[in-house]
Amino acid sequence: MMVEMDYAKKMQKCHEYVEALEEEQKKIQVFQRELPLCLELVTQAIEACRKELSGTTTTTSEQCSEQTTSVCGGPVFEEFIPIKKISSLCEEVQEEEEEDGEHESSPELVNNKKSDWLRSVQLWNHSPDLNPKEERVAKKAKVVEVKPKSGAFQPFQKRVLETDLQPAVKVASSMPATTTSSTTETCGGKSDLIKAGDEERRIEQQQSQSHTHRKQRRCWSPELHRRFLNALQQLGGSHVATPKQIRDHMKVDGLTNDEVKSHLQKYRLHTRRPAATSVAAQSTGNQQQPQFVVVGGIWVPSSQDFPPPSDVANKGGVYAPVAVAQSPKRSLERSCNSPAASSSTNTNTSTPVS
């Protein structure tokens, strides 16, 4: 009875263990892409437990008899039923570890393992019946055939063009693989440099063509300027006319509004300069002190200070005549010829001399 109780407890524990594993399997199925190996291990454990339960139910009588004999004093040979699948997997793992221990010095196998873990997705779906060597060859083939279809991280791979591969194929027939890889890299680098130089030359040619295709600057000939002035006179002056109106009046082929506008601005600046110079000259002339000339003891302003008659009439100024000192000879002659002097002489002559 005690043996049957122990057996029932073991069966109950196995059922509970299977249920717990099934719950974990449901949780891991959500992250099937991220945790494929964990999901595979859990499913294998569930299958092993179920096989153990099915095997134990069919052989309950045999186990009970063996256990009763063991209780009676006989030796116990087996307590658990061995599982072929798990044992075979353990043996394969041990063999792989031994082979890896023999070939630890080769760095290529280490790199292959890393690439297997990073790139391969179907490594854990292998069949247990294959030999370790065949399994390793199948893994390598799968790594080569896998194509990046998902959005996961992929290592950077330089794109090699067909034109760059042609010289590399020719060199491969006469040189080993190590030298061919170096030559392909150098050829690819040279071709990239040549392409970059060609692009720069093409850009420079386009820029030079754009400079040549630019419109030349307008040269304003005397005839063109005369038309410009006629248009200004008809339109009412440079401050009233607009560039568009001037261009319409001039009727010149190829003349643009911008060219007329720039010429109009230059003309306005040119017409403003004489007015500014005349105002500056007047201001400097007013600041100069008047000059005087001494004539016969009288201060007389110089002729430069007198404006012309037209200016006098325009300004409306009044000027008085200036008496100029005469020479002494002419003054004596005039005094002799005057009637007062003659009468005085006559009286002097008529009076008797005492």
UniProtKB/Swiss-Prot annotation:
DNA-binding region per UniProt: 243-268
Induction of its expression: Induced under phosphate deprivation conditions.
Compositional bias per record (Basic and acidic residues), positions renumbered to this chain: 103-112
GO annotation (BP), single: cellular response to hypoxia
Residue segments, region Disordered: 93-112, 324-354
Composition-biased stretches (Acidic residues): 93-102
Designated name of the protein: Transcription factor HHO2
A GO term from the CC aspect: nucleus
Cross-referenced Gene3D superfamilies: Homeodomain-like
Listed GO MF terms: DNA-binding transcription factor activity; DNA-binding transcription repressor activity; transcription cis-regulatory region binding
Localization terms from the record: Nucleus
